[in-house]
Curated annotation (Swiss-Prot):
Gene: kdsA
Keyword Ubl conjugation attached: no
Keyword list, A-Z: Cytoplasm, Lipopolysaccharide biosynthesis, Transferase
Coiled coil (UniProt feature): none
HAMAP family hit by this protein: KDO8P_synth
Matches recorded under SUPFAM superfamilies: Aldolase
Main location, first listed in the record: cytoplasm
Keyword Lipid metabolism found: no
Pfam family, one: DAHP_synth_1
Protein name: 2-dehydro-3-deoxyphosphooctonate aldolase
Gene source species: Xanthomonas axonopodis pv. citri (strain 306)
UniProt GO BP: keto-3-deoxy-D-manno-octulosonic acid biosynthetic process
Compartment list: Cytoplasm
GO molecular function, one term: 3-deoxy-8-phosphooctulonate synthase activity
Enzyme Commission numbers on file: 2.5.1.55
Length: 276
């Protein structure tokens, strides 16, 4: 599949979607995007910058949600033009899709909205590549009908993203079989290595996380075989305004990516035949 200006798939190198969870300030987004461009350029990794203008599903109603649509799009446009990288953001049910699609290169649907038929169709009808996150409550094979809805709009640039499955209260688990199962959708599969270590609502008024397991799950996913990696990152996760406990430190991103790209090369060299 053609994504932005590069090809993605199991016959192509791993690509990266990364950035801070939420847009905190113009300068932070430019700094992080610039550093990620430097790292990915050095390693030869195709890169899409990600950040959200509105986090509509925060645990607490008083938590920081972002700068909003107008200011958020200004920041994303600045990142795109000044840093020279494609940008992705997530949208919601009442987002003016065409307005967002006029700025960003890739749209993303939140996991909680994966079963909302009209929403999925409206996003995909905007004509941009779409990264559809699998709900924490959804079986991997249940992504096939979701993709069918998405492609019924005529949009063939659809990706599916694994971000963990609910495992009791305040916990997620990553079933690596799902990455293989979701290939049956015919779409590139992306693994979200940072939300997969989230502890939803685990801190009472906010979600917790176990970022020490990000490399563990990322390595496992790459070994199974994926097209892309999604990872939220921050210069100082302890001060991040959203999802800090599961964000990967920016100064450790190069080391992680270097390892993952080596694993990706070996994995894809040996193919993906299923064994009975």
């Amino acid at each position: 599949m053609k994504l932005c200006d590069f090809e993605v798939g199991l016959d192509q190198p791993l690509f990266l979607i990364a950035g801070p969870c939420v847009i905190e300030s113009m300068q932070l987004q430019l700094d992080v995007a610039g550093k990620l461009k430097e790292i990915t350029g050095k390693l030869g990794v195709n890169f899409i910058f990600k950040s959200s203008f509105d986090k509509a599903n925060r645990t607490s109603g008083t938590s920081f949600r972002g700068p909003g649509l107008e200011e958020g799009l200004k920041v994303l446009d600045a990142v795109k033009k000044q840093i020279g990288v494609p940008v992705l953001t997530d949208v919601h049910e009442y987002t003016p899709m065409n307005e967002v699609a006029a700025v960003v290169d890739v749209l993303q649907t939140p996991a909680f909205l994966v079963r909302q038929t009209d929403f999925i169709k409206n996003v995909c009808a905007a004509g941009k590549p779409v990264n559809i996150k699998k709900g924490q409550f959804l079986a991997p094979w249940d992504m096939k009908p979701v993709v069918d809805k998405a492609k019924s709009t005529g949009n063939e640039q659809i990706m599916v993203c694994e971000r963990g499955a609910s495992f009791g209260y305040n916990n997620l688990v990553s079933d690596m079989r799902s990455l293989s199962v979701m290939r049956d959708t015919g779409c590139p599969v992306v693994f979200d290595a940072t939300h997969s270590v989230q502890l939803p609502g685990g801190q009472g008024s906010s979600s917790g996380g176990q970022r020490e397991f990000v490399p563990v799950l990322a390595r496992a996913a790459v070994a199974v075989g994926i097209s892309g990696l999604f990872a939220e990152t921050h210069p100082d996760p302890s001060k991040a305004l959203s999802d800090g406990p599961n964000a990967w430190p920016l100064d450790r991103m190069e080391e992680l990516l270097e390892t993952l790209m080596e694993l990706d090369t070996v994995t894809k060299k040996h193919g993906f035949a299923r064994f009975a």
